[in-house]
Regions:
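Flexible loop/turn segments at secondary-structure boundaries
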Residues: 32-37, 68-71, 99-103, 123-124, ...
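N-terminal hydrophobic targeting/anchoring segments and the immediately downstream early-domain regions
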Residues: 10, 14-16, 310, 317
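Single conserved hydrophobic/aromatic residue that forms the stacking wall/gate
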Residues: 1-8, 12
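Metal-cofactor-binding active-site regions of metalloenzymes
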Residues: 20-38
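Active-site microenvironment of metallo-dependent hydrolases
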Residues: 172-188, 192-317
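Alpha-helix-loop-beta-strand connector modules within alpha/beta enzyme cores
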Residues: 15-26, 81-88
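Histidine/acidic residue-rich metal-binding segments in metalloenzymes
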Residues: 43-63, 69-134, 141-162, 172-187, ...
Length: 317
């Protein structure tokens, strides 16, 4: 399963995201599984991650969720940190509510940012200790309103905009970083500051020295807006070439994927078929509802739906 996992990673990095009208970068997963209690499809240790640091579109180690393992000097976690540091790349944090001496130890280990701040006091403590703050506004968590004081000097030069988890439907309907910029401007933030936090600051943080600004020596990745209030993107330029206009790509890229690698990744669900009948629950008694007794042994529709969801996730695991 480790081999399949690595083949899947290679497919994402080498095949499906190259030569697009979009620059796609990666952070390596630091916690697979997320905790020792998880039953993941694979366990990725430092030795499996190490070769990927040499790839130019791999920028570092993703959110170090096992913050307490880091503070307690777990050898496996520290080895991942050492490998990333030796490669000269970034280590992202994930440490909600970590404070005081434990936060000091976490940052001293080499963790350089955090996206889990839900209030301004937590963000300020982490800023004062040298971390970058990723202001998160996604589907599952929305922290921007609580962190609005960061959208001004002297803090905004160390803060950037991120979504963390955002559902595809929300991306299509509302947008990505552009959505956060619009929301920030509507809340009274200086448009120049909001744009800088969505472009220049993250590029500086991740070491993308020639991206994030309109200036000599920078890659001509540009957008043309109708205005700064609605922040409607009219045109998108990639390396100086017009690639999208009024929300549509002009020349969609043909996806080329190594067929052998594709088969190894997608032909990987080794389990018996799960049927809805296996997951249906039967009532064993009666209960009063709307003035009448329900029938014993009736199938509950909510459990039928749950069964379908469970079957999907069981297959995905």
């Amino acid at each position: 399963e480790i081999l399949r996992c690595l083949v899947g990673s290679e497919m994402c990095i080498r095949d499906s995201t190259r030569d697009l009208a979009l620059s796609v970068y990666f952070m390596l997963p630091s916690c697979v599984p997320a905790t020792g209690l998880d039953e993941s499809g694979a366990v990725l240790e430092a030795e499996q991650l190490r070769p990927y640091y040499q790839l130019p579109r791999v920028l570092g180690l993703a959110e170090l969720m096992n913050s307490y393992g880091t503070v307690r000097a777990d050898e496996k976690i520290l080895q991942k940190i050492c490998d990333c540091t030796a490669a000269g790349k970034r280590i992202d944090g994930h440490a909600p509510f970590l404070s005081g001496e434990e936060l000091n130890a976490y940052i001293a280990a080499g963790v350089q940012s955090d996206h889990e701040c839900s209030d301004i006091h937590e963000a300020m403590e982490k800023l004062r200790r040298g971390q970058y703050i990723m202001v998160r506004e996604g589907t599952a968590a929305q922290n921007m309103d609580s962190l609005l004081p960061l959208f001004q000097e002297p803090y905004c030069s160390r803060c950037m905009l991120v979504t963390d988890d955002k559902h595809p439907g929300d991306l299509l309907q509302g947008g990505h970083i552009d959505y956060i910029i619009r929301k920030a401007i509507a809340a009274g933030v200086d448009p120049v500051v909001a744009v800088r936090m969505g472009t220049l600051v993250p590029c500086q943080y991740f070491g993308l020295a020639h991206s994030g600004a309109v200036a000599p020596g920078y890659t001509a990745d540009l957008i043309v807006l109708s205005d700064l209030e609605q922040f409607t993107v009219e045109q998108v330029y990639k390396k100086g070439k017009l690639v999208a206009q009024q929300g549509r790509m002009l020349h969609p890229a043909a996806l080329t994927v190594d067929k052998a690698r594709f088969a190894r990744v997608f032909d990987s669900f080794n389990m018996d078929e799960v049927t809805p009948e296996q997951l249906q629950l039967k009532q064993t008694g009666t209960r009063q509802q709307s003035g009448r007794n329900e029938t014993k042994g009736a199938n509950l529709p909510c459990f039928k739906a749950l069964g379908r969801c469970s079957a999907f996730w069981a297959a995905a695991a």
